[in-house]
Swiss-Prot record:
Lineage: superkingdom: Bacteria
Chain sites annotated for binding L-isoleucyl-5'-AMP: E554
Motif 'HIGH' region: chain residues: 57-67
Keywords: Aminoacyl-tRNA synthetase, ATP-binding, Cytoplasm, Ligase, Metal-binding, Nucleotide-binding, Protein biosynthesis, Zinc
Domain characteristics, as noted in the entry: IleRS has two distinct active sites: one for aminoacylation and one for editing. The misactivated valine is translocated from the active site to the editing site, which sterically excludes the correctly activated isoleucine. The single editing site contains two valyl binding pockets, one specific for each substrate (Val-AMP or Val-tRNA(Ile)).
Gene label: ileS
Entry function: Catalyzes the attachment of isoleucine to tRNA(Ile). As IleRS can inadvertently accommodate and process structurally similar amino acids such as valine, to avoid such errors it has two additional distinct tRNA(Ile)-dependent editing activities. One activity is designated as 'pretransfer' editing and involves the hydrolysis of activated Val-AMP. The other activity is designated 'posttransfer' editing and involves deacylation of mischarged Val-tRNA(Ile).
This protein's name: Isoleucine--tRNA ligase
Required cofactor(s): Zn(2+)
């Protein structure tokens, strides 16, 4: 007889196959239709706010996996906070000014010189907004929940106005100044660069040793002696005005082939090796302390100019000669030491890297090509001691990938010195997940120079500065506020569309402009000043947000970028950090740990993965990686994640299928009346949920991923749900033992769905839509399951039982291999524990055979089988015949003539109760 229809088999419409690429857009359309983001905010209105401030990605180009990693973790954080009772608005942002957009337009064929600056800026604006729409669609497709209709954008008039006001506040406090100073300069971009825009790449440079003749030895050094310098930038020699020594080092005057030279004693051997001097033939004539040689004068090797001997702490014995070529116009250390000695700042190179008339005979030559010409000139005059070439790490423009130079130009600076200690104090008060994050930003602030905030471009926020006829700088607070008001109304193009007098307050006068003539600054602000002002233009400006934010979370490159500029401007103007906590993630590499690049063909694009596998697969991958370090992704890695997803989905299908006839309002069993194994599984669930809260709060998603797999695969699938089939399918529908188990299955189903909702939001909402008797229209409007106290004694008891059960499973497997049995229900188990406590534990169960998933189990007092870890186990083929309904073996089955033939007493009882 076929008893299939008498079994309570799982029933659910929840499909086995995810079909995420097609299903996710439908779910997202429902979210938009329901105005889910607004409903989530409404639900938590008036509760404790949690503010994660979005670091703005640059509005140019397709999003990559680094963007996906960043946005998905932010979304996981905010979805969890919202489900955990926080008012958690998420306002995405975009960074929109700067060179890449200008370059992108040029590549599209825009001829900048054929139009006005204002017209070119309009094209830049339109391009940026177009890019934002493309990126926005990609971010939304990843399931990122936020105020996408009202993002903040650095080109918005209100944002730009607040940025100008922030500049005004810093100027009023004396933190803004103009000076000629060597800055990182990119000839390929024709602009100065901030430290954050520099990346290091290998470069081959000339290495030359040059002799400078003594001009005035101050009675210490003879006139025919030469100082030896070493440099890898021969092109900077036209700007040389000094040679720096270290006051504490010993210097030696040595005789080599009838000529005397001065070098640091500690470097003499190195110099001999480098220039080819025979060490045996080198005679030390005199020894000096560096301090003794201060103010000795040398002669420039090819320009009629003195080169003063000065002292500087930056001179070391790490390399070179201990005598350092000093050009204040081309080096930061040179500039600093040069200020002390009031040296001329000579920088005879223009914005394109071409020598100016100040370079004399080299005028019109590109700086890099001058290396060869200058070296040849030195050789011809006998000043070149050695030329070599070597590969070293050299600063490059992070956008054009071309080398940069140090070049002294008139620039605007934000003083770091004046606020450095305050920023360091603010860092001390900031929370960091990892200590190295704190060390990194602390050291960067401690060691950084003043911040170059000017750029020689047009697409950006203008520096709101005017000049009087006599050259006086005008930075009055009232003037800057007037400009901010104009910008708030008309946007920053007003700066380019109006004359200086029309940008100043009506009737404005200045003693430096007797004729009422003014000019305006042409430079724009560094883009890091744009995004670094977002705490003012966004956190303080938007009513749903607040300053300081609870969290800033970006890639680890932002310690020198956005984290740095933000805390600098916030401390300078508000006296405190804009973030309470700082968290960072690593970079996304390929499966072998290599950087992704088109040339290697190893790029994995979010768009492609979403189309092939779905966004929830990318999100589950994000959960699975240690994001604090660099992470790896590849097709193989994503396939592994897909397998984990499939297992999760199958588990949910089973859970849903077994509560189709369960109503928690009428069928749930109180905890005290639950069958003990169900109490155990409920406590296991509580443990998982409690840990999930802890991991969410600590941003430890990898730990949660590992515990999730253990809970689903080991606790549920391998044990509880496997054991449960004999109850859920076989027992009477309304029996206590079945309702007890359904109570726990339902709790596992709803709790697990909620816990996973921030991770795989599409799948979680799909599960929720198939879950009977839930009241919320979306899982994202539900509350996270609460932290519960756990019965550790009960868990300990059952965990130990499961260890004994492992012995039984091994014995069953061995018996199956010996072909004694097939399925485990064909087995009868005879077990004796190795100690009295375990023996008593086994005897306390009245359904041991069910727990072993066998037809029979008996606790025996004498060992009959094989010794295992905790017990002695014998497995035989079960006696009797197979019940045609439950497939358990029984020695008592109904006869063929019975109304319900060939069933065991338990099944007969169930059938007769219907």
């Amino acid at each position: 007889m076929d008893y299939k229809d008498t079994l309570l088999m799982p029933k659910t419409d929840f499909p086995m196959r995810g079909g995420l690429p097609n299903k996710e857009p439908q779910i997202q359309a429902q979210w938009d239709e329901k105005k889910l983001y607004e409903k989530i905010l409404k639900k938590n209105e008036g509760r404790t706010p949690y503010i994660l401030h979005d670091g703005p990605p640059y509005a140019n180009g397709q999003i990559h996996m680094g963007h996906a990693l960043n946005k998905i973790i932010k979304d996981m954080i905010m979805r969890y906070k919202a489900m955990n009772g926080y008012y958690a608005p998420y306002v995405p942002g975009w960074d929109t000014h700067g060179l890449p957009i200008e370059t992108a337009l040029t590549k599209k064929g825009v001829d900048r010189k054929s139009m006005s600056e204002a017209e070119f800026r309009e094209l830049c604006r339109a391009y940026a907004l177009e890019q934002i729409e493309l990126q926005k669609a990609d971010f939304k497709r990843l399931g990122v929940n936020g105020d996408w209709e009202n993002p903040y954008i650095t080109l918005q008039e209100k944002f730009e106005a607040e940025q100008i006001r922030l500049f005004g506040d810093m100027a009023a406090k004396g933190y803004i100044y103009k000076g000629k100073k060597p800055v990182y300069w990119s000839p390929s971009s024709e602009s100065s660069l901030a430290e954050a825009e520099i990346e290091y790449q290998d470069k081959v440079s000339p290495s030359i040793y040059v002799a400078f003749d003594v001009l005035d030895g101050k009675g210490l050094v003879d006139d025919d002696v030469k100082f030896v310098i070493w440099t890898t930038t021969p092109w900077t020699l036209p700007a040389n005005v000094a040679i720096a020594l270290n006051k504490d080092l010993d210097y030696v005057q040595v005789r080599v082939n009838d000529t005397s030279y001065i070098v640091a004693q500690a470097l003499l051997d190195n110099v001999c090796d480098a220039v080819g001097w025979d060490k045996e033939g080198v005679q030390i004539e005199k020894t000096f302390k560096g301090a003794d040689l201060e103010f000795v004068k040398a002669r420039h090797p090819f320009i009629d100019r003195e080169s003063l001997i000065i002292l500087g702490d930056h001179v070391t014995t790490d390399a070179g000669t201990g005598c350092v070529h000093t050009a204040p116009g081309h080096g930061e250390d040179d500039f600093i030491v040069g200020q002390k000695y009031e040296l001329d700042v000579i920088s005879p190179v223009d914005g394109k890297g071409v020598y100016t008339s100040e370079a004399g005979e080299f005028e019109g030559m590109y700086y890099d090509k001058a290396n060869k010409v200058i070296t040849e000139k030195l050789e011809a005059s006998g000043h070149l001691l050695k030329l070599d070439f070597f590969k070293h790490s050299y600063p490059h423009d992070w956008r054009t990938k071309k080398p940069v130079i140090f070049r002294a130009t008139p620039q605007w600076f934000a003083s770091i010195n004046k606020v450095r200690q305050d920023i360091l104090n603010a860092i001390e008060e900031t929370e960091f997940k990892v200590e190295w994050g704190k060390t990194r930003i602390y050291n960067m602030i401690r060691d950084r120079g003043d911040w170059v905030i000017s750029r020689q471009r047009v697409w950006g926020v203008p520096l709101p500065v005017f000049y009087a006829e006599n050259g006086d700088i005008i930075m009055d607070k009232a003037v800057i506020e007037h400009v901010a008001t104009l910008v708030e109304k008309h946007g920053t193009n007003v700066w380019y569309e109006r004359e200086a007098t029309d940008l100043l307050p009506e009737g404005y006068t200045h003693p430096g402009s007797p004729n009422g003539v003014f000019t305006k600054e042409k430079d724009i602000m560094d883009v890091w000043f744009d995004s670094g002002s977002s705490h003012r233009g966004v956190l303080e400006a938007r009513p749903e947000l607040s300053f300081p934010a609870d969290l800033y979370f970006e890639g680890s490159d932002q310690y020198r970028g956005w984290f740095n500029s933000s805390i600098t401007t916030a401390v300078a103007t508000r006296g405190k950090s804009p973030y309470k906590k700082l968290l960072s993630h690593g970079f996304v590499m390929d499966g072998q740990g290599r950087k992704m690049s088109k040339s290697l063909g190893n790029t994995v694009l979010p768009e492609k993965v979403v189309k092939q596998m779905g966004a929830d697969i990318i999100r589950l991958w994000v959960m699975s990686v240690d994001y604090l370090a660099d992470v790896r992704i590849s097709d193989d890695i994503l396939k592994q994640v897909s397998e984990v997803y499939r297992k999760i989905r199958n588990t949910f299908k089973f859970l849903l299928g077994n509560v189709n006839d369960f109503n928690p309002a009428t069928d749930a069993v109180p905890y005290a009346e639950l069958v003990e194994i169900d109490q155990f599984m409920l406590n296991k669930l509580y443990t998982f949920v409690n840990n999930a809260h802890k991991h969410y709060d600590n941003n430890d998603y990898l730990f949660m991923y590992q515990e999730l797999q253990n809970f689903i695969n080991v606790e549920l699938s391998n044990f509880y749900l496997d054991y449960g089939k004999d109850i859920l399918y076989i027992e009477a529908q309304d029996s206590h033992v079945r309702r007890s188990m359904q109570t726990v299955v339902y709790e596992v189903l709803t709790s697990l769905t909620k816990v996973l909702a921030p991770i795989i939001p599409h799948t979680a909402d799909e599960i929720w839509s198939h879950t009977p008797h839930v009241t919320e229209e979306s899982v994202h409007l539900a509350d996270m399951p609460e932290v519960q106290s756990v019965d550790t004694a009960l868990i300990g008891k059952w965990n130990h039982f499961l260890e004994i059960r492992d012995d039984v499973l091994k014995a069953i497997e061995e018996t199956r291999n010996d072909k004694v049995i097939g399925k485990s229900l064909e087995a009868a188990v005879y077990i004796q524990a190795k100690n009295e406590e375990d023996q008593a534990l086994l005897k306390s169960f009245d359904n041991l055979h069910q727990l072993f998933i066998t037809s029979y189990a008996e606790v025996v007092d004498e060992p009959q089988g094989t010794d295992y870890n905790l017990s002695n186990v014998l497995v035989k083929h079960a006696e009797g015949e197979k019940c045609e309904r439950c497939w358990n073996y029984s020695t008592v089955l109904t006869e063929e003539s019975h109304a319900h033939p060939h069933v065991c007493p338990r099944c007969l009882s169930v059938l007769e109760s219907k």
